[in-house]
């Protein structure tokens, strides 16, 4: 019911603004439907499914028949496979360990994303489940973040171009990332920053 109320409220709000097109809800089967035709079970994991649809479009564009998609979001990482140009799926999907009667993309989601906080303990390096969120965000964003995150590590490893992050609208600060990795990870574990990465 809360989701239904939210979607209908959004749909009515758009109608109040006289939008020409109806609100369409993306589903985990790769399609979309109006609010009245959408079942909650079809929206479960629809975001990662959308990522797989995007990966499939890129695979087709570049002529790849087989592809592994690795989608790192703020709080999760979603991994899926495209084989012979099709997204791998389960004939009967699984939601929270329960079989359902609908097919679903076979996507593995891990609770570790770009905003996941990296800490240390007596066993070594720990990642998550805590997250810095969008505010203050990773240290390299320059908005006051003081915790090391996956995004800070990716920047220092060269995965991200600091000048082109977020379409060039956000310049990443490698010095801040280096400082937070050194002080919160490398120094407590008596490692070089290189080894901590």
Where are these regions (language model features)?
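N-terminally biased helix-coil "hinge/interface" segments that flank
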Residues: 1-197
């Amino acid at each position: 019911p809360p989701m239904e109320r939210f979607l209908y409220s959004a749909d009515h709000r758009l109608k109040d603004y006289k939008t020409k097109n109806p609100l369409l809800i993306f589903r985990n089967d790769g399609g979309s439907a109006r609010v009245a035709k959408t079942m909650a079970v079809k929206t479960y994991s629809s975001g990662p499914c959308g990522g797989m649809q995007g990966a499939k479009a890129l695979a087709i564009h570049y002529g790849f028949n087989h592809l592994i998609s690795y989608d790192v979001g703020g709080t999760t990482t979603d991994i899926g496979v495209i084989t012979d140009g099709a997204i791998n799926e389960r004939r009967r999907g699984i939601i929270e360990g329960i079989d359902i009667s609908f097919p679903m993309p076979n996507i593995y989601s891990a609770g570790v994303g770009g905003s996941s906080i990296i800490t240390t303990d007596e066993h070594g390096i720990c990642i998550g489940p805590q997250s810095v969120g969008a505010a203050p965000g990773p240290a390299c964003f320059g908005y006051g973040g003081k915790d090391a995150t996956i995004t800070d590590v990716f920047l220092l490893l060269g995965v991200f171009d600091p000048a082109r992050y977020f379409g060039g609208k956000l310049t990443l600060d490698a010095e801040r990332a280096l400082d937070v990795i050194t002080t919160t990870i490398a120094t407590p574990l008596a490692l070089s920053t290189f080894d901590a990465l």
